[in-house]
Regions:
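Catalytic glycan-binding domains that act on GlcNAc-containing polysaccharides
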Residues: 45-225
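Bacterial N-terminal signal peptides that target proteins for export
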Residues: 16-27
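Bacterial N-terminal signal peptides
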Residues: 26-35
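Boundary at the C-terminal end of the N-terminal hydrophobic targeting segment
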Residues: 41-43
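Methionine residue identity
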Residues: 1, 12-15
Length: 225
C-alpha cells in the first residue's frame, strides 16, 4: 500500500517463498511499501528498517556463505508445507548473516547455536516434525533428527535444514510476511499479536537487519549463480 502524503517509504518483502509454476518457473516476490504512520509500533519498526536499509555483504562474507551454498540450495528445494512453495535461498543467507555472520560454532548467551542460532528446544521440536515428513533429506538422516542433541546444531547441514523448515513453517503461519516470520524466529512463534511483530528492540532490529541483507542479496544475485 502506498502512502502518497508520506515522503519516507521503506520497502519490505512480504513473500519469502517462491512458487514453482508449470509454465513460469520464476521466483515470485510481493514488494509492499511500509508507510511511516504515527502508530508507535509501526514507527518503531520503520526506524530499524531505515537503519539497515543500506547494509551490504562484504567480499569475505560472500566467501563464507559460498561454503554453505550447496546445503542452502538443497534444503530450500523442499516444499515443506505447500506444493511448489519453497523457501528463498537468499532469505536463508540473510538469516545466516544476521544471526552468526556465517560462524557455524556461534553460541549466544541464550544458548542459541550454529549458523542460524537455533535454540535446542525449538530445534528438537522441528526435528520431530521433519521425521514425520516423507522426505529423504540426503545430508541429514532421520535417525539423526530423531536423536538430535544440542551439539548437532553446530553442524551446518543440520542447522540449515532446521532453519529452512522453521522459516517455511513461520512463513506458512504468517502468510509470507517477513516481519512476522523474523519475529517468530527471534522472539518465538507465539510472540505475534494483532498481526504485528513482537515490540522488543532486539526483535525489531533483527527484522530490519534480515530485511536489509535480503534486499542486498536479491539485488546482487550474480554472486550466487
Amino acid at each position: 500500500m502506498w502512502c502518497p502524503d508520506t515522503p519516507l517509504v521503506t520497502y519490505m518483502i512480504d513473500m519469502i517463498v517462491f512458487s514453482c509454476r508449470r509454465f513460469i518457473p520464476v521466483i515470485l516476490f510481493v514488494f509492499t511499501a511500509v508507510c511511516f504512520y504515527t502508530s508507535p509500533a509501526t514507527a518503531s519498526l520503520n526506524k530499524y528498517m531505515a537503519k539497515h536499509r543500506g547494509i551490504e555483504v562484504s567480499r569475505e562474507q560472500h566467501k563464507r556463505l559460498a561454503d554453505y551454498d550447496k546445503l542452502i540450495k538443497h534444503f530450500c528445494s523442499f516444499s515443506f508445507f505447500e506444493p511448489r512453495h519453497k523457501v528463498n535461498p537468499d532469505f536463508i543467507r540473510a538469516l545466516i548473516l544476521a544471526e552468526s555472520n556465517c560462524k557455524s560454532t556461534a553460541l549466544s548467551c541464550k544458548n542459541a547455536r550454529g549458523l542460524t542460532q537455533i535454540i535446542y528446544t525449538t530445534g528438537k521440536q522441528a526435528a520431530r516434525e521433519l521425521v514425520q515428513k516423507d522426505f529423504d533429506y540426503k545430508y541429514v538422516s532421520k535417525e539423526q533428527l530423531q536423536n538430535l542433541q544440542p551439539e548437532d546444531l553446530y553442524k551446518p547441514e543440520v542447522n540449515i535444514l532446521l532453519a529452512c523448515y522453521l522459516v517455511a513453517k513461520y512463513n506458512y503461519q504468517n502468510h509470507g510476511k517477513l516481519d512476522l516470520v523474523v519475529s517468530a524466529w527471534n522472539a518465538g512463534e507465539y510472540s505475534i499479536t494483532d498481526n504485528k511483530p513482537a515490540q522488543y528492540k532486539e526483535t525489531l532490529n533483527h527484522i530490519g537487519k534480515v530485511n536489509g541483507y535480503f534486499l542486498y542479496l536479491l539485488k546482487n544475485k550474480q554472486s550466487f549463480n
